[in-house]
Amino acid sequence: LLYQVSTAGLAADHVAHPVRGVLNKKGIKFRMGSPISVDHKNKSIKLDSSETLDFDHLVVALGSATNDFGIPGVAEHGLGMKNVHEAIAIRAEIMRRFEDLCRFEDDTRLSIAVVGGGPTGVEMAGALAELKRGPLKNDLASAAEHIDIYLIEAGPRILPMFSEKLSARAESDLHKLGVFVRTNTAVREIQSRKIILKEGEPIPAEVTVWAAGVKGEPTAGLLNLPIVGSRIDTDENLEVNHYPNIWAIGDINGSKNADGRFYPMVAPVAMQQGKWVAKQILRKAAGQPLQPFKYRDKGSMATIGRHKAVVEVGKFRMTGPLAWYAWLWLHLFYLLGGRNKIGTIADWTWNYLT
């Protein structure tokens, strides 16, 4: 839901929840800090707070970081969307640029580009279009009409993990919202106020949102564990290869599925792996053999705009208002904290009615 924070659809404190507040109820001690090193011989981990924690089992769940694929200018001119702070930064930049646009009475335009045609990029582009058609138009229609929104995807279609039919439907919905969708468009460099392509004319972009992909969190390199790609090398049981009692889950996990591919970096995988590792630790404690992890794919969904979404569960596919309501319900269900749920419902209701 971070993209809704960045487009002023949700308040930041409605999508974030204090970790300590959740864990205290389970009798779990929480420490905030970044790992500096792991002493594998003595089974201890040192944090940047100078605290050293001993362990019998270590579960590494560092998550992921924005992947710039070595493209020049992404770090300097692109805005990532991996946490609440980055989402707020995007919102502030868009609003600042819009206020600048309001001062002009000529044909000056504001171009906002989203790079990456996966679910994050598609949802971000759709939310920007809704922001333009709603709050910004109500604020100053003449300025809102001068906003251009681009969605740039290097591959042949957006939402490649969905069926071709649903990808086409999502692209059609974005077109109806006024988004310029550019597929088969690879980025060579991000510069100030424009995007340089490998082929074709540059795309103007006063604001560039980078949603082209993620990689394993680089902090994992400090743990002296085997790395494959950008992830921790992990066996089928989710245990780090050659390091008994050390586990890796979520985006940092480097185990592979039956097809020999890494598991997708999505929340359902992390949630299932977290529960699985808990069971594995209990199995070890009871002297039972470990069981290989098997991911249960429960489907994919993406929202494009109001009453516009796509859902795919196996061969079942759904689009339009029903898919949109299903998306709302599912995301509301997984939000932590009753206050967050109530606040999110209030934000969504207000946005829907206004």
Short names for language-model regions:
Residues 121:
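N-terminal Rossmann-fold NAD(P) dinucleotide-binding loop
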Residues 76-103, 193-196, 202-272, 276-279:
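FAD-site-proximal beta/loop scaffold in flavoenzymes
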Residues 63-66, 125, 214-216:
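Short glycine-rich anion-binding loops that position phosphate/pyrophosphate groups of nucleotides
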Residues 1-57, 162-180:
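N-terminal Rossmann-like dinucleotide/flavin-binding domain of flavoprotein oxidoreductases
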Residues 30-37, 129-236, 240-242, 290:
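A Rossmann-like FAD-binding core segment of flavoenzymes
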Residues 27-113, 142, 209:
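FAD-binding core/adjacent interface of flavoenzyme oxidoreductases
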Residues 115-118, 155:
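Glycine-rich Rossmann-fold phosphate-binding loop(s) that bind the pyrophosphate
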Residues 273, 278-354:
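C-terminal, flexible cofactor-proximal segment of oxidoreductases
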